[in-house]
Amino acid sequence: LAITSCYEDKGNYDYREMNDIEISVETESSFYALGDKVISKPELVFTLGKENSDLSYEWTFDGHVIGDTKDLEWIADTIASTKELRLAVLDNNTGVTYFGSTYISVSSAYASNGWVVLSEKEGNSTLSFLREQTEEGILKPVVTRDIYSMINGVPMGTQPVSMYPHWTERWDGEDKTSWLWVAQKGGQGAIDISGSSYKQEGILSQMFLSKSYPEGFVSVGVIDMQFLTMAIGEDGTIYTRVKDSNLLFNSSNFLDRPLTSDKEGKIKVDGSMIAYAPFDEHGGMVLYDKNSAQYLHIADYKNWQGYNYSGKVLPLKVEEYEYGPSDARLDNMKDYSVYFVGASLVDWGDISYMSIIKDKAGKFYMQKFKVEAYGGGSSVTKVGASFISQSEIKGLDAVIDGTSKNCFYLCRNQDKAPYLFISKGETLYFYYTDGNKLYTCAQFDSPIASIDAECFNNKYIIVDTI
């Protein structure tokens, strides 16, 4: 909110007491989407206590005239970030103009707060956008269906699998709204889509050195970090590229050789269980590699001298005294099956991880550990980690029993939402991570396909059913 009072001298030198005007301009919000109604009912305060009757009004936004009445009702039609919404009030008796203003932003209707849903309809991949809107405190999203086809004029593809956003530079990047990597098995395969306009921006296969996928590769996910991008195949094989600049979403090419964990380059890293963590201060991401039966840190870090360590594969280092006699070792999980690993933010740099594991006797456990931020260095061969606990989860064997698909979602903000959501068929459960208890949360009419709560303080949970 900005309150100003000023006037222009029009050369009227009749000396008399001026009935100056102080103008206060307020709006219901500071952020709008194209097509939203912007309403403002300004408050005018007259210094002599009596309102002038002969006044003219002019509203402008970013320098463009949008209204000529005292109260504003304007359908936002101009995209602009943090621009002045100004009311000019002309006193026709004196020729003096007074001003009041505030600052608002208008974005694409598809770049505002909300959710993008990837689904399949009549054999085709589709994207829908759910713009966040509440009515009397109740969430009632505005839904735009099949937005990709609407914008691009052609179907997106077939057999959709996953969707991940690009890492976005806070100040100087291409698009603060980010772009979206959509992986699909049919059509063009994985494609890159603008998160603002929903126009197609790229095709994964054309970003390999050979301008085509490596033999046998079928993309099921593309995960983009600040410098490193990982293209993941349905067999878990990972192909990587290191971007030339973190200001660009796509620069340089993917290597045609897979990511490996050994010096000889023979043991491929499995990317089917990545603890996706959109926190660039961590210097990479952690995954569980079933090929070597251990957790690995995949580096994403460039130092101030310009040396880029992105793409290095580093085991975790935990001091042996931190483990109990029966705890699973993070660098040797051969006696356990790992069903899920997720990440949550703790402090600047350090990331907390939680895994669902099962021993050979069929008991399920919650495994908690913390991984330090990776800071590069040619002599660094392992990333420091701290083992926190391993607790049995009673009743989980009835949820993860192999009879139906299980979906998992660990809330990022564990201080506000200490939950891990798990689905089985039509039933949604939540595991209370602070209290080590499993609860039934909700029942749906059809099987659950995905769970998401990626919003401020995890205040909403979105459940997609088949």
Feature roles, as predicted:
Residues 94, 134, 371-373, 435-438:
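Short coil turn/linker residues within repeat-based beta-strand modules
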